[in-house]
């Protein structure tokens, strides 16, 4: 797409926007979407190959999702996880069954959870939880976490420490202790990195 002024037809000047410029300052403002297509405030059409940084693959303005959200908003929005909600229970059961290969269990068959589900907002939070569980459940105070070089696990401090990208650590030093990194596809290096304080090996097969 051709470059254009940051002064949008909507009257919003992105050069004076108070949103923190975590990445390069945006010069496009999206105002509408349908399926895989997006339109900016200049009326130009784009194909969305990003999907909310690979976390939203259901398309924009999905009518089924819109209707479900509207229906739920008329009943209950968010409550603390101090209490149970119907949908959280059903999703947790579905996840547990999917992970353990019991999605096609006969109707009415007995069900007993094989594990536990913790809902959170992002992959970084999920990784933080994994580190905490590994440390809390490890015997004799083990705390070390081994990850791969050039990996990415999130932007929160411990998740960032797990990333095998030293240049991303430098602006936030000192990083949390206990994280080490080995080259991918080097089993010998991985085995050598394991020692008496290792609590977990944290690898993402797809990066």
Give the location of each predicted region.
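Residue-level signal for pocket-adjacent positions within structured domains
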Residues: 18, 23-25, 48-53, 71, ...
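Active-site-adjacent loop/helix segments that line or gate small-molecule/cofactor pockets in enzymes
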Residues: 2-34, 94
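Electropositive phosphate-/nucleotide-binding environments in soluble metabolic enzymes
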Residues: 9, 28-32, 59, 63, ...
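PLP-dependent aspartate aminotransferase-fold enzymes
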Residues: 96-203
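Active-site core of PLP-dependent enzymes with the aminotransferase class I/II
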Residues: 206-207
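Short beta-strand-to-turn element immediately C-terminal to the catalytic PLP-Schiff-base lysine
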Residues: 39-40, 58-60, 161-163
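Glycine-rich loop-to-alpha-helix module at the N-terminal edge of alpha/beta enzyme cores
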Residues: 45-140
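Active-site and channel-lining beta-strand-loop segments
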Residues: 27-50
């Amino acid at each position: 797409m051709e470059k254009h002024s940051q002064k949008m037809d909507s009257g919003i000047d992105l050069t004076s926007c108070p949103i923190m410029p975590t990445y390069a300052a945006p010069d496009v403002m999206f105002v509408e979407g349908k399926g895989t297509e997006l339109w900016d405030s200049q009326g130009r059409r784009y194909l969305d190959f990003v999907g909310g940084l690979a976390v939203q693959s259901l398309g924009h303005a999905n009518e089924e999702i819109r209707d479900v959200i509207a229906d739920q908003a008329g009943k209950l929005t968010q409550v603390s996880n101090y209490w149970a909600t119907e949908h959280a229970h059903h999703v947790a059961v579905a996840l547990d069954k999917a992970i353990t290969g019991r999605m096609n269990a006969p109707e009415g068959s007995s069900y007993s959870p094989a594990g536990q589900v913790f809902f959170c907002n992002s992959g970084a939070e999920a990784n933080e939880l994994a580190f905490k569980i590994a440390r809390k459940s490890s015997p004799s105070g083990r705390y070390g976490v081994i990850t791969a070089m050039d990996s990415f696990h999130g932007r929160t401090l411990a998740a960032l420490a797990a990333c095998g990208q030293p240049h991303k650590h430098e602006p936030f030093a000192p990083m949390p202790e206990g994280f080490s990194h080995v080259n991918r596809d080097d089993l010998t290096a991985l085995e050598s990195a394991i020692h008496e304080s290792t609590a977990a090996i944290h690898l993402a097969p797809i990066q």
